[in-house]
Amino acid sequence: MILIRYLIKEVFKSQIAILLILLLIFFSQQFVRVLGAAANGNVPADLVFSLLGLGMPTMAQLMLPLCLFIAILLTFGRLYAESEITVMRACGVGQRILVKVALIMSLLTAGIAAYNALWLSPWAIQKQVNMVEDAKANPTVGVLSSGQFISTNNNNVVLFIDKIKDNQIRNVYLFQMTPQKQTKPSVITAEKGELIALPNGDQVLNLKNTKRVEGTSALPDFRITHFDEYHAYLGYQSAENTNDEVAELTLSQLIDLDSSSAKAELHWRITLILAVPLMALIAVPLSRVNPRQGRFAKILPALLLYLIYFLLQSSFKSAGSAGKLEAELLMPLVNIGFFLLAVVLNSWDSEIMYKFRYLFSKKGSAKDDKYP
């Protein structure tokens, strides 16, 4: 029991350190992407950090299996290189204790991965989409962009701003496209103004030095009015989420849907959970190194095996979403194949495997004697 606690402690310390490093790498990559989208006007600037925070669960989907996989490789590899595991085996401790430690750590990590993949990530993705759509439908001064036409109030009002300086909008053009009650279509111009958000979510555009031209091209009775200060009520536009991405759907919604994309997404989420114990089991035999080789001797082939697993699953998910392949059949087969690989690798030095290896080597030598 003391030995198990020691090994778990060592793996856990490595896992936390690797998780922080991966978090920094993924966060920096996501920050550059969101910042670029904000610079292009695709994402409101004041939502950058909110979107980054909501993007953390999605980033954690791939980080959780990877950090445990690398932690087991590095920790057990160091113990092999320093001959600690050799001493353990000399005292009668075999491969089972390493597998047991890997399973304990993988079950704890898989629990977090399950909560993240099945509930937290879909909620965060849906929240991201709703925030962006709502900000586009009901812009504030912080998210307004100069030189762009902005539709508000269910496309009845179009706003154009020439400049934004010191939280003030300059050279404002407000187009009321459709008649409202006794009011004809109009164009409002102003030197400057500000957008005020009311507590109930409605918005009021406060304009100064304003001129309003009201009328239609069909009738010559145009009305021109000058205002020192003009308040335009923009109201609140409910954002309609037309995005049908299955990544936003909850677990119950995915199960109820019968589409190929929903099935592929469901099996992808299951894969993100099963990948934790599968990769942990595979990491145990791959961490075994000769003390002269160093602890990093098998890092590259282990990472290649990890990449092959996720590339296969990602390819089957994409093809399944497009309806080209049956993801619900192929993705579980990959999991079964890697599970069998983990069993074979972990039992390679067992008595049963020794018998099989001896049997095949004996057959091979017999063939060599028969055909010299």
Swiss-Prot record:
Species of the source: Haemophilus influenzae (strain ATCC 51907 / DSM 11121 / KW20 / Rd)
Keyword terms: Cell inner membrane, Cell membrane, Membrane, Transmembrane, Transmembrane helix, Transport
InterPro entries: LptF (IPR030922), LptG/LptF_permease (IPR005495)
Gene this chain is encoded by: lptF
Keyword Transmembrane: yes
Name of the molecule in the record: Lipopolysaccharide export system permease protein LptF
Pfam family, one: LptF_LptG
Single biological process term from Gene Ontology: lipopolysaccharide transport
Cited function: Part of the ABC transporter complex LptBFG involved in the translocation of lipopolysaccharide (LPS) from the inner membrane to the outer membrane.
Subcellular location: Cell inner membrane
Keyword ATP-binding: no
Coiled coil location: none
Subunit structure, as described in the record: Component of the lipopolysaccharide transport and assembly complex. The LptBFG transporter is composed of two ATP-binding proteins (LptB) and two transmembrane proteins (LptF and LptG).
Transmembrane residue ranges: 16-36, 54-74, 101-121, 266-286, 296-316, 325-345
Domain of life: Bacteria
Family designation: Belongs to the LptF/LptG family.
Chief location bin: membrane
Its membrane topology: Multi-pass membrane protein
